[in-house]
Each structure stands twice: as C-alpha cells, then as structure tokens.
C-alpha cells in the first residue's frame, strides 16, 4: 500500500470515529501511526485531505466488485462517465436475476459489516459537501461511477432507460444502507431479508419480477 493510501485510510477511520471536527492532519498521523507532519506532507490543505479521502473511498468500493466482462454500454449513462472495466454485478432480470440479487446483497452486507466504517466516513463527507462545492463535485463523480456500473448491467438486460433505472436503484440502496447504519430503525436485516429486499427493489425499479 502506498503512503498516500495509508494516510487516506487513516482519514476514513478518523472520520468514522471522531467525525468531521476530529479530522485534522495530526489526528490522521496518530491514526496511521506515522510521524507528525506526514499527512500534511502529502496533503497540504484540509481540502486536499478530504479530496484524497473521497477518492480512496471510491477506490475501496471498486475493489468490492469483482470484474465482469461482456457488458455493452447503455443508452443513457450519466454524463461524463464511461463504462468502467469493473462492474461486479451479473446481469439483472432477463438474464440472471438471482445472481444479480445475490451479488448486490453480498456487497451491501459487506458495507453494513466490515465496510461500516467507510459508510460512516461517507456520511460525514456528504454533509460537509453541502457546504463545500469542490468536495461535492468529487462525491458526485464517485457516485456516477457506481451508477454507470449498474446502468451497464441494466442496458445489457434490455431494461428501458437503464441510466435512470440505475440511479433509482442506487438511491434506494443508499437509503437502505443509511437506515441500517445511522437511521432511527432498530431492525437489523438478516442475509435472507436483505436478499428479499433487494429482489423486490430490483423488480420494482426495472418492472420485471
């Protein structure tokens, strides 16, 4: 792992533990177990550190998704995004609904458990981005990549308006994640419930059961 990535990982941990107020260069140095001044050497400003953290979150998310091939581009992808080489999710209804559901459920479950820290950091960054347009831009770009991944799968399955349907699907999943991690609800979804919820969501969004 590179030193900048190590520092960004420490920033993620710091955000999840101490929130935005607790994110300082010195706090990140301590979290990374590095000499004081290390974080500021690579990321001179707070904005640079935040930007690196957003980019690292996107990189870690992409590693959760194993490569999938043979998926043609869709017809209404988010502007400015191509079809990433890593899609991770098999084709949805019309090709393999169960495989898509299982893969999506595995990813979401991992983000609720081993990846929970990342989600907490993401929520901190999302709130901060409402006051920092430059940070908002980085988060939007990261989200567009995920939506393009799903849209490519929907397009391959012949779903109409794959970009819009993918945006809806990802938005609903974001809501599910937030409810489980930071929402007021206390019910924790089992793997079976998670699979059922995603299956129902997929059918509703694509119009295919």
Predicted regions: what they are:
Residues 135-136, 140, 155-209:
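Hydrophobic/aromatic-rich alpha-helical bundle segments in the mid-to-C-terminal region
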Residues 138-145, 149:
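Short, solvent-exposed amphipathic helices
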Residues 6, 10-52:
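Helix-turn-helix
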Residues 55-61:
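Short, basic, alpha-helical segments at the C-terminal edge of helix-turn-helix-like DNA-binding modules
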Residues 65-119, 166-169:
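Hydrophobic alpha-helical connector segments
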Residues 10-18, 64, 121, 125, ...:
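Solvent-exposed, amphipathic alpha-helical segments
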Residues 113-137:
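Amphipathic alpha-helical segments used for helix-helix packing
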Residues 44-48, 113, 130, 134, ...:
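Residues in soluble alpha-helical coiled-coils and helical-bundle/repeat scaffolds
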